[in-house]
Every structure is written in structure tokens, then in C-alpha cells.
Amino acid sequence: MCTSGQIIGSLLVLSVLEIGLGVSSVAVGAVSFSLALREHKPQLGDSSPFLLCGICGILCAKKKSGLVMILFSACCICGLIGGILNFQFLRAVTKKTSSLYPLHLASMSLACIGIGGCTLSSWLTCRLASYEQRRMFSEREHSLHHSHEMAEKRLRAIEITDLPSCPVVPPTPELPTRK
């Protein structure tokens, strides 16, 4: 079973990979845009959702709060959808033209790697959330157990201090006299 530190480390590595993919995708998009302007050809898709996904992943690894984990999961899902749509768009464009094939292949490869990274990041986020949930339940259980122990000690202390200092012997009932 992975520890929280291992999960966070893996999440950081994947987030840096996603940022790299996002920057690379933006660069490929800029090159394709300049080529599209010169040749009047359709522009390639853009995988910049991976950039946003990577930034949210680093934030998630640092904060570890529930809200940030939900935000990161949403970004991963958006990255998955964006990557799949980008891949499908590029596949359709590649069939029509072959002059930009190396650029299309690079964009499709970035989209595939980004899809894989988003999938792994989503899985790791679920693992991290599960780990944090177990940790919180364990802390709550420990705290509850500790509060019960303290309550029992207080009750014993109250019982001891409420006793009179000298023992009181109950009176013995008198026996009836015989006639």
C-alpha cells in the first residue's frame, strides 16, 4: 500500500509532466497557427487543458484539502475530454492533408500522453482522497477514545472527592424485644 508521501510525489511528477505537455502543446499550436496563416490551412487543435491540469495538480499535492482535490479531479476530466477531442480533430485533419503530417503526429502524440497523464492523475487523486479520509477517521477515533478515557478519569476523581473523610457506619436496626 502506498503512503501519502509516495502518492503526493507521484502526483507532483505527473503534474510537472502535464505542465510540460501543456507548454509543448501551446508551442505546437503556435507553430501550426503561423503555418495556417501562411498556407490558409486549418489550425491544429490545442492541448492547453493539460497545462491547467498540471498547475492544479501541484496545488492539490501541496494543499491536500477536499475542495482542491475536487478542483483537480475536474481539471483532469476536462483534460481528458480536451485531449480526446483534440485527438479526434487531428485524426480527421490528418486524413485530409498530409503536408503537415509530422506536426499532426507530434500533436496527436502529445494528446495521447496527456490523456494518459490525466487518467493517472485522476486515479492518484482518488487514492490520495481515500488515504486522507482513512487518516481523518483514524484521528477522529483516537480523539473519541481519548475523550472517553478523560471522562472516565474525571468521573473517578469526582467519586473519590465526594466521599466523606470519615466513614459513616449505618445504624443497625434494633432487634425486637422478647416478652
From Swiss-Prot:
Transmembrane regions listed in the UniProt entry: 11-31, 44-61, 67-87, 100-120
Xref: InterPro entries: TMEM196
Topology with respect to the bilayer: Multi-pass membrane protein
Keyword set, alphabetical order: Cytoplasm, Membrane, Transmembrane, Transmembrane helix, Tumor suppressor
Gene source species: Pongo abelii
GO cellular component labels: cytoplasm; membrane
Domain of life: Eukaryota
Function recorded in the entry: Acts as a tumor suppressor in lung cancer. Inhibits tumor cell growth by inhibiting cell proliferation and migration and promoting cell apoptosis. Inhibits metastasis of lung cancer by suppressing beta-catenin expression in the Wnt/beta-catenin signaling pathway.
Stated name of the protein: Transmembrane protein 196
Subcellular location: Cytoplasm; Membrane
Main location: cytoplasm
One GO BP annotation of this record: negative regulation of cell growth
